[in-house]
């Protein structure tokens, strides 16, 4: 019904606003049974067919993507990198804490010492623009019980506490970022409240990554690898949904 109802918007504007009385008088052209009643069965079957066609097209796309990505996989060499060399720009969070900022459900992500919700504690006002930091980076959690040593990839801009340090590299995207955070998290077992993840210790951490023939991080391999995993998971889900249609 939604596409048909939305067509009513063509009749209205700021000079002729919709109201309760006008909406009551509106008429919708819908499929009807032989008895003149709304044919809900037809509408449901029609939309299921549309959904099924879209699903089949999507399945084909992801099958092809998985096939292409698999061709790019294969043997790979690995090399150790100092975190400070991998991320030439390492900056700490700028916020002084939630007591100094107003919470807002429609605001910006506020990051803190947690590995839950991709590091997001809540959403806050954007008023203090000096504390807003750019996304497309990796957030390294340096404090917090149960969270110290973890890292998360952040795509969006954010405000964060000083318990986190953010690494920037021009090759980062959500695929290379999640590849690196998965490996970077292996270090979490070495830290505790007696041996904290200071900024200095963080910069000296070692991350082992796949490399190309020049010995540089193989960003293309990392991206292809994560795309392959993503496609495989989506493909599994879509097949499950497709099986539901069979019933």
Regions found by a protein language model. Give the residues of each.
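A structural detector for beta-sheet-dominated domains
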Residues: 31, 84, 141, 170, ...
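Eukaryotic intrinsically disordered and solvent-exposed regulatory patches
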Residues: 13-14, 96-97, 125-126, 152, ...
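A short glycine-rich beta-alpha junction/loop motif
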Residues: 15-34, 158-164, 195-213
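Non-catalytic DNA-recognition/assembly elements of restriction-modification systems
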Residues: 33-97, 101-118, 213-247
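A short beta-sheet element
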Residues: 1, 121-182
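Conserved hydrophobic/aromatic beta-strand scaffold that supports enzyme active sites
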Residues: 27, 110, 137-139, 166, ...
């Amino acid at each position: 019904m939604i596409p048909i109802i939305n067509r009513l918007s063509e009749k209205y504007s700021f000079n002729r606003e919709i109201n309760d009385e006008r909406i009551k008088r509106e008429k919708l052209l819908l499929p009807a049974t032989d008895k003149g009643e709304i044919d809900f069965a037809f509408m449901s079957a029609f939309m299921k067919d549309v959904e099924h066609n879209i699903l089949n097209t999507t399945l084909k796309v992801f099958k092809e993507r998985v096939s292409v990505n698999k061709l790019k996989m294969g043997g790979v060499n690995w090399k150790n990198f100092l975190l400070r060399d991998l991320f030439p720009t390492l900056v700490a969070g700028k916020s002084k804490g939630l007591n100094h900022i107003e919470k807002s459900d429609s605001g910006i992500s506020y990051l803190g010492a947690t590995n839950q919700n991709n590091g997001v504690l809540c959403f806050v006002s954007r008023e203090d623009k000096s504390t807003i930091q750019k996304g497309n980076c990796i957030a390294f959690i340096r404090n917090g019980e149960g969270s110290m040593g973890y890292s998360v990839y952040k795509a969006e801009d954010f405000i964060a506490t000083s318990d986190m340090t953010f690494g920037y590299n021009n090759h980062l995207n959500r695929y290379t970022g999640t590849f690196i955070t998965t490996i970077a998290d292996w270090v979490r077992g070495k830290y505790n409240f007696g041996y904290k993840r200071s900024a200095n210790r963080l910069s000296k951490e070692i991350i082992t990554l796949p490399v190309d023939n020049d010995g540089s991080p193989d960003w293309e391999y990392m991206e292809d690898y994560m795309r392959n995993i993503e496609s495989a998971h989506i493909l599994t889900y879509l097949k499950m949904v497709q099986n539901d249609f069979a019933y």
